[in-house]
A protein has these predicted regions:
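Bacterial N-terminal signal peptides that target proteins for export
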Residues: 1-10
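Bacterial N-terminal signal peptides
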Residues: 9-19
Length: 340
């Protein structure tokens, strides 16, 4: 077994993953998913394209999500709605496309008084979480859990009126939703002027507000997500996750304008850490990786960077077009096993 060590000025640190010991500052091995235009791309750690999925109509909003069966969930803008949710880019249509390119599910969800914004979250039970805004720009809107039915149908099985729970003082629109299967809780981040992170109880229909953080943000919040040892959108445990380095249970978000990725501990109600980084004015994403590194996208840029816990860039990919978000999936994730 090959052992690597790195001497830091605060001592000797090493990270145990599986049966080998690797540097915490090494890139986390896996596949990175992002989209440009109508196409989603999967790249390996050597920056080679492994696979791609293409939608036939509409435009992909924010990011696609790779599911355990190798299919991809897309939030799409195919038109048909009457207004933009709180001024955000709308989606309104959700598609699942298989590894081989077959459309497995194509469902449109909007109404006269609500339109989904650009994010969606896959769930372990096969459902999806959708954030939708009202025509009135100052109110955040609602969360909907939708159960897919057939090839073109869906049923709302849970909802949370975020505007009602947070009150009239919180203004802005929801632009990110993230589910924590271990806690059965939903995280949202709300755009300016509120600049708020909020957590809601998903375990029952009351959907009570559990946590709210609105301290010290002056930028535009995007891509808020849980730090979890589960693969994104699943309840499948990541086998090589280092819970201590990851700081499981914290939440992280991009704060454009502040030029930071901000991490908060909802248990202690404290800001844990911030990564200084050059962000754009729009969108972006941040993901804590199983080795403690952090994957960051500057929204509407062509750059994906992986930073170690000292803020050093250890892996970078320049894409061929502008992207909104990107997510890394480990080598042992079911969605990529035996697919390439």
């Amino acid at each position: 077994m090959k052992t690597k060590y790195k001497l830091l000025n605060v001592g000797l640190f090493f990270l145990s993953i599986s049966q080998s010991i690797v540097l915490a500052s090494d890139p986390y091995p896996g596949y990175t998913l992002f989209s440009i235009g109508r196409t989603a791309y999967l790249y390996d750690i050597d920056k080679k394209k492994v696979h791609q999925w293409k939608v036939s109509e509409g435009s992909i909003q924010t990011s696609p999500y790779l599911l355990p069966d190798g299919s991809v969930l897309f939030p799409l803008n195919k038109g048909g709605f009457t207004f933009r949710p709180g001024g955000a880019h709308p989606s309104g249509t959700f598609q699942k496309i298989s590894w081989d390119g077959e459309v497995l599910w194509d469902f449109s969800f909007f109404g006269d008084n609500f339109t989904p914004s650009y994010d969606v979250e896959p769930m372990p039970n096969g459902n999806i979480l959708v954030c939708a805004g009202f025509e009135e720009r100052r109110r955040p809107g609602k969360l909907f859990e939708i159960k897919p039915i057939g090839k073109n149908g869906g049923e709302v099985v849970w909802e949370c009126n975020v505007s009602e729970k947070l009150g009239d003082l919180v203004q802005g629109y929801i632009n990110s939703v993230s589910f924590n299967p271990s806690l059965d809780q939903v995280l949202v981040n709300i755009q300016a002027p509120a600049r708020t992170l909020a957590i809601f109880d998903h375990s029952n229909s009351k959907a009570n507000l559990i946590f709210k953080w609105d301290k010290g943000f002056t930028g535009r919040l995007h891509g808020g997500c849980w730090v979890t040892d589960r693969y994104l959108g699943t309840n499948i445990q990541i086998p090589d996750a280092d819970k201590k380095l990851m700081r499981i249970g914290n939440i992280i978000t991009v704060s454009n304008g502040d030029n930071q990725a901000v991490e908060v501990n909802p248990k202690t109600n404290e800001r844990v850490e911030s990564f200084n980084y050059e962000f754009s004015e729009h969108q972006g994403s941040v993901q804590r990786l199983p080795n403690g590194n952090t994957l960051i996208v500057s929204g509407y840029s062509q750059q994906i960077n992986e930073l170690d816990n000292n803020g050093k860039i250890v892996w970078s990919l320049e894409t061929s077009g502008r992207i909104s978000r990107a997510y890394r999936y480990g080598l042992k994730y079911q969605g990529v096993l035996n697919k390439n």
